[in-house]
Amino acid sequence: MNNPVRMPGYGASQTAQTDAGLRAHMLGVFRNMGIGLVITGLVAAFIGNTPALAAAIFGTPLKWVAIFAPLAFVFFFSFRIEKMTTAGARMAFYAFSAVMGVSLASIFLVFTGGSIAQAFFSAAVMFLAMALWGYTTGRDLSKFGSFLIMGLIGILVASLINIFIGSSAMAMVISIIGVVVFTGLTAWDVQRIKSEYFAYAGHEVAQKMQVMGALSLYLNFVNLFQMLLSLTGERE
């Protein structure tokens, strides 16, 4: 009887290549996210610690531009991403990060440096824990997506309303719900990004998806940080 030809190393080699590709993809996502956070932090710190510049922005009607520009940028980015090159998408994300830095500069005028650092550290720990869980869990998190997105929309609408009514009680409720929603979104997005890699690996769009994944995780982290700062921050 003839024995079939066997290639015992083929399956293992293919699995290793897939694992290496996934790691490279996720590292690309987190690298872009990290660069975006650095840009945001530098811009926010520079404006927040330059009184004349901060007064020119937040002491005039320009503050409304600073508040709403990031939201407008996200919508623009989402609708234009398919027509952008990978390099163009990456530069647009970095530009958005700078715009977000202008918007976040106001925290340096309201909260102490120590409480800002504490909220950032807490957000980083929570974000990393949920990202790791989302990456490693075998549980399907996609079923939670609709609830998390509805929660996100609710937070967005309530936050816009509270800009004009200025209710501290409403702000606290938004922040508490926001912490839950954005930690959940972090795990959900990481698993989604991982799944999308397997669907589009080898295609040119995969590189662009690194940028979109970075934007999603960046927004989760920044919003989680803001919610924690609102809850725990010590005011000047």
Language-model-detected regions and their locations in the chain:
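A hydrophobic alpha-helical transmembrane-helix feature that marks the membrane cores
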Residues: 1-236
